[in-house]
Amino acid sequence: MRRLRAVPVALTVVAVASAVCALSLGTPYVPPARLPATLGSDGLAGIVVTELRLPRLVLALVAGACLGAAGLVLQEALRNPLAVPEMLGVSSGAALGVAAPLVLALSLPLGLQPFLALAGAAFGGLLTLVAAGFGRSPSSVLLTGAAVAAALQAGLLVLMVMADQLDLQLIYRYLLGSLSARTWDDVTGLLPWLAVALPALVLCVPVLGVLRLGDDDARALGVRVERARVAALGIAVVLIAPVVAVCGPVAWVGFLAPHLARRLKPDGGAAGWLVRSALCGAVVVLCADQPARLALAPVETPVGAWTALVGVPVGVVLLKRGRRAARRSDRGPAPAGPASDASLSVPGRATEPVRGAEPVPLLRKAER
């Protein structure tokens, strides 16, 4: 119990330390004690912290929370811990929707990028559901989604071959996910999408709790399973598409954050896991952005490379531990000995001795 209580405290400490590092470290360096006075000042340090580092910090938290919540919605709706946006064609479709106009030299305003990402993500997700029979089998949806994601990534490779050198560098950097050079305009561009997604998440939580019981039990309780899965996919698309439009596909946050949330409180339920998954996703992206910004300074590395580098092995370890714990709980306590066998015997029938076992004392006296 103490260990479970210490984990949220540790996450809070890590988040605060990462936030201080995000605002202090870099060029110019700002000591943590001077951060309150530096925010909003007219000097060089104040402009860098207020206009560059602080919006990047807020964007990392918002993007991570959206990806973590979307990952949990997909995993709960499909009842599969491997259901992630990268495996269902959602992230690849959103990236394709943003990259295609750039390569085709279409002059479109920047405000349309979230809508292009939304259209691409919806196309990839709906293509997965249509090919899998509208979610009749969670395993078939996952396998079909992997095939659709591979096809969309092949389309991205074709676009990269068609692009010139400058566009190729932009697309390559975009596909790895980056928070570099993001401003307050990028942060405010996510707010309308959050205003749509948050009420939908609140309405979706009870349905996710029912879907955990299985398709037959959910139908018996009045839930239309296929429509519920389509709605869950739509909510995940609304959460993922604007993040991909602004930051690119930040990989495997939707895989790691739900497993961390379940690890923190295994019996939390869909509502508790959703909040914890969003918080864990925000902390993961914020922590991953620090080595992305500072490891090879002054050159920045994509944050998506660090989330994939850390998220995949940690998520696999958490997944294995969760399965082991589930197996132990399913086995239950072992029988206490001959007394438990006697309690299971049917009255009126003689109990035959088990072969290879030592006879009980009453049988020994009868043999004498």
Task: Write out the residue ranges for each language-model feature.
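Alpha-helical transmembrane segments in inner-membrane proteins
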Residues: 1-348, 354-368
